[in-house]
C-alpha cells in the first residue's frame, strides 16, 4: 500500500430520471445524498458514514421488505456541493438501484415484490429531504469515496421524468450542457 495517500475530488457526470414532477427534463440534479438500495456498501465497515435517522425514516415510510438489503444514505462532499451548486441545479437525494429492470420498478412479465415501492420512494420526505432522481452509481461512489478519504459529487442530466411521463427530446444536448457546466465549475 501507498504510504502517502492523496485525497481526490471525484465528480460523477451522468444521466438519471427525475422522480418529482417539479424537476423538468433537460435540467440538472446535484445529489446531496446517495441512497444505496442494493446493499453493495454492506460489504464494508460503514458505521461512520451512515445517516441512521434518515435511513430509519425511509425504511419506515416505505415499509421496506426485511429480505432486501437495508438502505444506506450517504452524504456528498459539502465542499464540492458549494463549488457546483447554482440557480440551475436542483438538489436532493439520489436513489441508486442495483439494476435497470425490477430494481427500478420496471415491470416486464414478472410481478414486482412491492408494486407500490416507486410511489413510496417518490413520496418520501424527511425534514425537506426528498428523493429527486434514480440511477445506478451515486451511492457506491459516495460511500467508497467517504471510506477512502475522497470527496465526491454526483451531477445528473435529467433525461426523463417518471412523475410526468416526459422524456428529453435531445438527451445528448442536456448531457453535453452538463459536461460544459461541470468543466466551467472546475475551471472556476
Per-region residue spans from a language model:
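Active-site rim beta-loop-alpha module in soluble metabolic enzymes
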Residues: 53-126
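Polyanion-binding loop/helix "lid" in catalytic or ligand-binding cores
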Residues: 71-76, 131-138
